[in-house]
Amino acid sequence: MYNYFYQGHLVRKCLGQHFLHDQNIIESIVAVIHPLPSQALVEIGPGLGALTKYVAKYVKTITVIELDHNLVAYLANHPILQHKLNILSQDVMKVNFSDLAKKLSQPLRIFGNLPYNISIALMFNLFRHIHMIRDMHFMLQKEVVSRLLAKPNNKNYGKLSVIAQHYCQIDLVLDVPPESFRPVPQVDSAVVRLVPYVIPPYPVKDINKLYLLTSLAFQQRRKTIRNSLRNLFSVEQLLTQGIISTLRAENLSVEQYCCLASTLAECLPKK
């Protein structure tokens, strides 16, 4: 075990810190985000400001969310950024993004190099505030991006795929090799764009039922739907939805999960 310093900062592995340093990648990400002066830009995990500095050229203010107090102090005293940043020094998992959007008087444009150790949990949290988000651009582990984009009948297809694709149009923007970071991670990364649907292609009457269904179905993904959802649907009820009960969780489409969730919402009281 040894300490790793980057630009004088002690990297905290417990926070999943990997700092982007590749100039070409940074400029490509900013071009994709295409920030405009009047927009509410929010960066998660700004780190040492590698991406922040370039986005700041186009906007008056950026809200940044950073847990590491050493990095907060660095950003607060940054010669270029200090007058442009609204710094939230807190755990991003505890941020109420709906309240933040109301405070900024418009939907949020959220971006960042997400910490590997909380990226999936954070996205599920963000989906709960989706009505207050304009778009999201995230650097993620390539494996997580594969899960976001996965289609049925694929081993990467799961709860994250269904929930994310219900809420958003998702596009792979850029592949990012490990050597673009310091310290160098042991995984490949990619930048993904998520744009919330104004009207979801597959509406759901109660989103909590979709969360429940996908949790049960993918908890033991090798089980048949008949077994994993046996406490919610009979074989006959599944057939009325056009679903063969011997299929497995990964065989059902996003549309089918959404239809099942709406059917369930009609049968079970909303909680």
From Swiss-Prot:
Keywords: Cytoplasm, Methyltransferase, RNA-binding, rRNA processing, S-adenosyl-L-methionine, Transferase
GO CC annotations on file: cytosol
Top-level EC class as recorded in UniProt: transferase
Gene Ontology molecular functions: 16S rRNA (adenine(1518)-N(6)/adenine(1519)-N(6))-dimethyltransferase activity; RNA binding
Coiled-coil stretches: none
Record family assignment: Belongs to the class I-like SAM-binding methyltransferase superfamily. rRNA adenine N(6)-methyltransferase family. RsmA subfamily.
Protein name: Ribosomal RNA small subunit methyltransferase A
Species for this entry: Baumannia cicadellinicola subsp. Homalodisca coagulata
Top-level taxonomy: Bacteria, Pseudomonadati, Pseudomonadota, Gammaproteobacteria, Candidatus Palibaumannia
